[in-house]
A protein has these predicted regions:
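Ubiquitin-like/PB1-type beta-grasp interaction modules and other compact soluble beta-rich domains
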Residues: 2-128
Length: 128
């Protein structure tokens, strides 16, 4: 009796079981989380502070919209924040974005939560 079909069948079953284990590992990795801490500083000092735990890969702007009252205008380059927690900058002042203590080099919509982030919005004077 030829045992080849039984060996091939056993190998296929083994590979299917092995691929099932790999999927569980990927699913566990997808459940990893990171923390985004949003701090908002206006003319009179701190307006709001909120820490949010979310899955890695979450968009910082989407998290902000869900957890802090924010108004914005959407442009081709991304959202321009106009009001946070009911506070609007006066005159030519603007909302400045700092991420992990440094002035942001990109917009809030371009930050992805792949590690813990400290996100701070401050009203600053325009240099113009």
């Amino acid at each position: 009796m030829d045992k080849r079909p039984a060996v091939i069948f056993a190998a296929i079953i083994f590979l299917l079981l092995l691929s099932g284990c790999m999927q569980k590992t990927d699913a566990a990795a997808a459940g990893e989380t990171a923390k985004a801490t949003f701090t908002v500083t206006g003319y009179q000092g701190k307006i709001a502070e909120k820490a949010v735990e979310a899955e890695k890969g979450a968009n910082a702007f989407e998290l902000m919209k869900k957890n802090i009252s924010v108004k914005y205008t959407l442009y081709s380059f991304g959202p321009l924040i106009t009001e946070i927690e009911g506070t609007k900058p006066e005159g030519s002042d603007y909302w400045a974005l700092y991420v992990n203590g440094k002035y942001a080099e990109k917009g809030i919509a371009d930050y992805i939560l792949d590690e813990d982030l400290e996100i701070e919005w401050k009203i600053e004077k325009s240099p113009y």
